Amino acid sequence: NLEKFVRTVPDFPQPGIMFRDVTTIFNNAEAFRECVNQFAQLWNDTKFDAIAGIDARGFIIGSGLSYKLELPFVPIRKKGKLPFETISESYVLEYGKASLEVHTDSITEKTKVLIVDDLIATGGTVSAAVKLIKRLGGEVAGCGFIIQLPELGGVSTLELAGVKTKSLLSFGGH
Protein backbone atom coordinates (compact mmCIF):
# COMPACT_ATOMS: atom_id res chain seq x y z
CA ASN A 1 0.00 0.00 0.00
CA LEU A 2 1.79 3.11 -1.28
CA GLU A 3 -0.51 5.50 0.54
CA LYS A 4 1.24 4.84 3.84
CA PHE A 5 4.50 6.14 2.33
CA VAL A 6 3.04 9.52 1.33
CA ARG A 7 3.85 12.21 3.87
CA THR A 8 1.25 14.95 4.34
CA VAL A 9 2.65 18.35 5.29
CA PRO A 10 -0.04 20.78 6.50
CA ASP A 11 0.09 24.45 5.48
CA PHE A 12 2.84 24.02 2.87
CA PRO A 13 3.64 25.98 0.76
CA GLN A 14 0.92 28.22 2.21
CA PRO A 15 -1.81 28.06 4.87
CA GLY A 16 -4.70 25.75 4.02
CA ILE A 17 -2.71 23.49 1.69
CA MET A 18 -2.13 19.84 2.59
CA PHE A 19 1.07 19.08 0.66
CA ARG A 20 1.35 15.44 -0.46
CA ASP A 21 5.05 14.61 -0.36
CA VAL A 22 6.07 11.62 -2.50
CA THR A 23 9.78 11.91 -1.72
CA THR A 24 9.06 9.47 1.10
CA ILE A 25 8.19 6.88 -1.56
CA PHE A 26 11.45 7.62 -3.37
CA ASN A 27 13.41 7.39 -0.09
CA ASN A 28 12.30 3.79 0.44
CA ALA A 29 13.71 1.34 -2.11
CA GLU A 30 10.90 -1.19 -1.65
CA ALA A 31 8.18 1.49 -1.92
CA PHE A 32 9.83 3.03 -5.00
CA ARG A 33 10.13 -0.36 -6.70
CA GLU A 34 6.46 -1.04 -5.90
CA CYS A 35 5.48 2.38 -7.25
CA VAL A 36 7.26 1.74 -10.55
CA ASN A 37 5.78 -1.77 -10.80
CA GLN A 38 2.26 -0.48 -10.10
CA PHE A 39 2.71 2.30 -12.65
CA ALA A 40 3.79 -0.22 -15.30
CA GLN A 41 0.80 -2.44 -14.48
CA LEU A 42 -1.59 0.54 -14.55
CA TRP A 43 -0.54 1.39 -18.10
CA ASN A 44 -0.04 -2.12 -19.52
CA ASP A 45 -3.17 -1.77 -21.69
CA THR A 46 -1.83 1.32 -23.47
CA LYS A 47 0.69 1.45 -26.32
CA PHE A 48 3.40 4.10 -26.07
CA ASP A 49 6.91 4.53 -27.47
CA ALA A 50 8.45 6.94 -24.95
CA ILE A 51 7.96 8.31 -21.47
CA ALA A 52 8.13 12.05 -20.76
CA GLY A 53 8.66 13.18 -17.19
CA ILE A 54 7.85 16.65 -15.92
CA ASP A 55 10.50 18.55 -13.95
CA ALA A 56 11.35 17.54 -11.25
CA ARG A 57 9.61 14.64 -9.48
CA GLY A 58 8.25 13.39 -12.80
CA PHE A 59 11.87 12.69 -13.72
CA ILE A 60 12.16 10.20 -10.88
CA ILE A 61 9.08 8.10 -11.59
CA GLY A 62 9.54 8.57 -15.34
CA SER A 63 13.13 7.35 -15.43
CA GLY A 64 12.27 4.37 -13.21
CA LEU A 65 9.40 3.44 -15.51
CA SER A 66 11.53 4.06 -18.59
CA TYR A 67 14.18 1.70 -17.25
CA LYS A 68 11.65 -1.00 -16.36
CA LEU A 69 9.87 -0.84 -19.74
CA GLU A 70 13.07 -0.30 -21.77
CA LEU A 71 11.72 2.85 -23.41
CA PRO A 72 13.31 6.25 -24.07
CA PHE A 73 12.91 8.98 -21.46
CA VAL A 74 12.16 12.58 -22.46
CA PRO A 75 12.75 15.29 -19.84
CA ILE A 76 10.28 18.18 -19.88
CA ARG A 77 12.14 20.92 -18.03
CA LYS A 78 11.56 24.28 -16.50
CA LYS A 79 12.54 27.10 -18.86
CA GLY A 80 16.24 27.72 -19.37
CA LYS A 81 17.52 24.31 -18.23
CA LEU A 82 17.98 22.47 -21.54
CA PRO A 83 21.17 23.13 -23.55
CA PHE A 84 19.98 22.49 -27.11
CA GLU A 85 17.22 23.92 -29.31
CA THR A 86 13.88 23.88 -27.48
CA ILE A 87 10.25 24.84 -27.75
CA SER A 88 8.45 26.23 -24.73
CA GLU A 89 4.92 26.45 -23.42
CA SER A 90 3.73 28.83 -20.72
CA TYR A 91 1.12 28.04 -18.10
CA VAL A 92 -0.54 29.90 -15.26
CA LEU A 93 0.42 29.35 -11.64
CA GLU A 94 -1.53 30.56 -8.65
CA TYR A 95 0.75 33.61 -8.41
CA GLY A 96 2.07 34.18 -11.91
CA LYS A 97 3.25 32.27 -14.96
CA ALA A 98 5.88 29.65 -15.66
CA SER A 99 7.13 27.81 -18.74
CA LEU A 100 8.18 24.29 -19.63
CA GLU A 101 10.57 23.33 -22.42
CA VAL A 102 11.53 20.23 -24.35
CA HIS A 103 14.30 19.62 -26.89
CA THR A 104 13.00 19.86 -30.44
CA ASP A 105 14.68 16.57 -31.38
CA SER A 106 13.34 14.55 -28.43
CA ILE A 107 10.05 13.51 -30.05
CA THR A 108 9.55 12.50 -33.67
CA GLU A 109 6.33 12.65 -35.67
CA LYS A 110 3.68 10.16 -34.45
CA THR A 111 5.69 9.07 -31.39
CA LYS A 112 3.22 7.91 -28.75
CA VAL A 113 4.21 9.44 -25.42
CA LEU A 114 3.14 8.69 -21.85
CA ILE A 115 3.57 11.85 -19.74
CA VAL A 116 4.21 11.25 -16.04
CA ASP A 117 4.42 13.40 -12.94
CA ASP A 118 4.14 12.91 -9.21
CA LEU A 119 0.83 14.72 -8.73
CA ILE A 120 -1.99 16.41 -10.60
CA ALA A 121 -3.91 19.25 -8.98
CA THR A 122 -5.31 21.93 -11.33
CA GLY A 123 -3.62 20.40 -14.39
CA GLY A 124 -1.85 23.56 -15.61
CA THR A 125 1.63 22.07 -15.71
CA VAL A 126 0.67 18.81 -17.38
CA SER A 127 -1.56 20.64 -19.89
CA ALA A 128 1.52 22.61 -20.97
CA ALA A 129 3.44 19.33 -21.32
CA VAL A 130 0.64 17.87 -23.48
CA LYS A 131 0.84 20.93 -25.76
CA LEU A 132 4.62 20.54 -26.10
CA ILE A 133 4.35 16.90 -27.17
CA LYS A 134 1.64 17.73 -29.70
CA ARG A 135 3.58 20.70 -31.09
CA LEU A 136 6.46 18.33 -31.88
CA GLY A 137 4.09 16.01 -33.77
CA GLY A 138 3.88 13.42 -31.02
CA GLU A 139 0.72 11.75 -29.78
CA VAL A 140 -0.13 11.77 -26.09
CA ALA A 141 -0.98 8.18 -25.14
CA GLY A 142 -1.95 9.35 -21.66
CA CYS A 143 -0.90 11.16 -18.51
CA GLY A 144 -0.04 9.22 -15.37
CA PHE A 145 0.40 10.40 -11.81
CA ILE A 146 1.29 8.90 -8.49
CA ILE A 147 -1.36 11.12 -6.85
CA GLN A 148 -4.42 12.95 -8.06
CA LEU A 149 -6.32 15.64 -6.17
CA PRO A 150 -9.70 15.32 -7.93
CA GLU A 151 -11.33 18.30 -6.21
CA LEU A 152 -8.90 20.65 -7.97
CA GLY A 153 -10.16 19.64 -11.43
CA GLY A 154 -6.98 18.74 -13.30
CA VAL A 155 -8.04 15.21 -14.22
CA SER A 156 -11.43 16.46 -15.44
CA THR A 157 -9.75 19.14 -17.55
CA LEU A 158 -7.49 16.59 -19.24
CA GLU A 159 -10.30 14.09 -19.80
CA LEU A 160 -12.53 16.80 -21.33
CA ALA A 161 -9.63 17.49 -23.72
CA GLY A 162 -9.61 13.80 -24.68
CA VAL A 163 -6.47 12.85 -22.73
CA LYS A 164 -6.51 9.54 -20.87
CA THR A 165 -5.40 9.87 -17.24
CA LYS A 166 -4.60 7.32 -14.56
CA SER A 167 -3.32 7.69 -11.01
CA LEU A 168 -2.11 5.27 -8.38
CA LEU A 169 -3.56 7.23 -5.45
CA SER A 170 -6.26 9.81 -4.86
CA PHE A 171 -6.47 12.27 -1.97
CA GLY A 172 -9.28 14.66 -1.09
CA GLY A 173 -8.69 18.32 -0.35
CA HIS A 174 -5.97 20.65 -1.55
What is the predicted role of each segment?
Residues 1-174:
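PRPP-associated nucleotide enzymes
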